[in-house]
Amino acid sequence: MGDSGSRRSTLVSRLPIFRRSINRRHDSLPSSPSSSNTVGVHSSSPSSTNSSSGSTGKRRSIFRTPSISFHHKKGSEPKQEPTNQNLSISNGAQPGHSNMQKLSLEEHIKTRGRHSVGFSSSRNKKITRSLTEDFEREKEHSTNKNVFINCLSSGKSEGDDSGFTEDQTRRSVKQSTRKLLPKSFSSHYKFSKPVLQSQSISLVQQSEFSLEVTQYQEREPVLVRASPSCSVDVTERAGSSLQSPLLSADLTTAQTPSEFLALTEDSVSEMDAFSKSGSMASHCDNFGHNDSTSQMSLNSAAVTKTTTELTGTVPCAIMSPGKYRLEGQCSTESNSLPETSAANQKEVLLQIAELPATSVSHSESNLPADSEREENIGLQNGETMLGTNSPRKLGFYEQHKAIAEHVKGIHPISDSKIIPTSGDHHIFNKTSHGYEANPAKVLASSLSPFREGRFIERRLRSSSEGTAGSSRMILKPKDGNIEEVNSLRKQRAGSSSSKMNSLDVLNNLGSCELDEDDLMLDLEFLEEQSLHPSVCREDSYHSVVSCAAVVLTPMEPMIEMKKREEPEFPEPSKQNLSLKLTKDVDQEARCSHISRMPNSPSADWPLQGVEENGGIDSLPFRLMLQDCTAVKTLLLKMKRVLQESADMSPASSTTSLPVSPLTEEPVPFKDIMKDECSMLKLQLKEKDELISQLQEELGKVRHLQKAFASRVDKSTQTELLCYDGLNLKRLETVQGGREATYRNRIVSQNLSTRDRKAIHTPTEDRFRYSAADQTSPYKNKTCQLPSLCLSNFLKDKELAEVIKHSRGTYETLTSDVTQNLRATVGQSSLKPTAKTEGLSTFLEKPKDQVATARQHSTFTGRFGQPPRGPISLHMYSRKNVFLHHNLHSTELQTLGQQDG
């Protein structure tokens, strides 16, 4: 009964209300650790104040939807207080103190809720949906309120949680964790001290809190760290329950408070798990202290009261877990169980899910405590799981003992992961029995696995979410999927496969409802596991299957499973655990699954929601989508290919352009482009040929034009040339000597021009060359010279306009043509020179005349010919040429007159 009660409290803590309260605790948890340092006063102290009946509403507002647990308690908190009074005389006798502890617990929750800010919003939605319904159902039961009040009264555990959060924040420094645990203990202890004050008012509350406080106090010196750890573990269970959406937190054994704290408490529970696993002695002490505290509370108080106290103690860390633990214990031990059976059982299952982790350490340190609890009928559900007295604890306990031990042997890390995954019952039974059987071994196994899981989650947290991510990491192994982890533990225990999924659990357990719940948790857990690769990846594949199964399986089947699970577990604890686990799993699945996604506001949750619902859930769907997309693409490609093959014509391809416009347009375009390219190439070839022809023609024309240009530029040149020929003829006939002198002069000019032909401009050179060329033939054939000159002149005149039009082009080609013409002219001028031996004789004989001619040619070069420098073109102005020709013509005229 106590087992179910503590489990209920854990379940309550797992409820989205508590999760949101954990979020708020996380928000306030930074102050909560400081509050933990302030032994008596936590940030949760105000929360404790809110814990009063009126404070339940404050809790609701504080925790928002996570307050659903508080909502329920708000509505049923008056009942809860009476039930608390019934369950725990201290709580009932002194509801003020119960409220006070509740306030402290609530304050812890608030602080955790603050810390769990990220989770708060996500949990709000979660709580709003399935958990709200469950909490409303529980609200109907005053027992739940009383249990919750007891849970709140057990603010010590919650204080422990918040202290544990502080401790967990320090748990990076494990020694700091121990210190923080005492601080949180002292805060819890002071909360307990109010309980002790109320103990003076009520022995039951006293016994509960005095036992808790005494145990905490007693163990606080020795197990101060341990008892906070224990409280935190219980609280972590409760918080794990609270953070059921954070299945990972539930998966982490020691992370119930972190679940409750969502983010900060996640760190706390992670730290707690680490401190437990890091300092197994302290971990065992914590659990032992918690168990002993629970047992002491159980022993000191009535079983119900003790259960309430234990629930309160463990739930103190988590209001809802405490409440449900108390409620579960009370319901198990009193009539509130039926009322709270739905929520309490779910809470118990959540507690179990959370307690499995706690139970792992709890049972380790609580082997004697478990014996006490067994004697006490496992007053705390989580502890009852540790204590095998409860029927379900015994039933699953032995099964899960072997499973837990088996899991420990096979998957020590999986133990912490798998045990939560295998199922709440399995986890608790496994953890409780296996850990009870082998406290040190199981403790090491659970601690090291939880450590590893938490570390894995830490890594994920640090990588994806920072501290919040770490909390989420822890929450996921611990809180988020405690049920899922329980189912996974069941699966793994059954199949010894760490990858066993809720489907495997269904196959192994043969309980579709329970397994479907586990499937839901598996789905969530896998989603959360997406944040924890090592923890989640094992089940991610199966979670995909379970995701599909869950998607196919409505939420109702999970409720049906819960209902079926209730008969499956005839014993009240088992029924409560199964029912509430299923319920909580369903709510958890719906709340954490549905509200997780909607409640992404928290840094953790958005990632979780995305990763959970969008990551692992969507992983197979993404793969399927990719495959479908690839197939679609291939089909489209095939269709295009077929269409193209069928429609080879560009028109048909254009018609099929809508299907594949790019593929089909290129066909005609390519053809057109090819045609255009070929056309252009042909045009280029033609143009090149034309250009070459034109260049050749230009070369020819240029040769003529240069003489003609000279003549056109110098109107006297053509006449001069003809006149020169005629004059030379007359000179030769009349005065051979004078003519010879003139010819010699011309030849000398030609020679001098030939010597510097590279410098001469083509026009003048040509004129000189043509004059020279025609001078030498004139000696042999004088009559040909006028006709040649005339023909050349006519040719030049005919080409004059063409030359004028193409003068620009000729200018561009002038250099090349000039070189060619110079070469040809040089050859032609050499021929006349070779032929004119007479000229050479003249040159040889009248050297003085040659010198004179050269001087004249020099003069002529100065005036008529361009200078040799690069400024020849500048110097070769019409003025100079005209002057030169005038002088030359004047000289010839003088000679002619002399001849005449």
From Swiss-Prot:
Residues 29-56 have a biased composition (Low complexity). The keyword Coiled coil applies. The keyword Oxidoreductase does not apply. InterPro entries: CCSER. Residues 81-100 have a biased composition (Polar residues). It comes from the Eukaryota. Residues 1-100, 156-178 are annotated as: Disordered. Residues 673-707 form a coiled coil. Keywords: Coiled coil. PANTHER family: SERINE-RICH COILED-COIL DOMAIN-CONTAINING PROTEIN 1 (PTHR22461:SF1), SERINE-RICH COILED-COIL DOMAIN-CONTAINING PROTEIN 2-RELATED (PTHR22461). Belongs to the CCSER family. This is Serine-rich coiled-coil domain-containing protein 1. It comes from Homo sapiens (Human). The lineage of its organism: Eukaryota, Metazoa, Chordata, Craniata, Vertebrata. The gene is CCSER1.
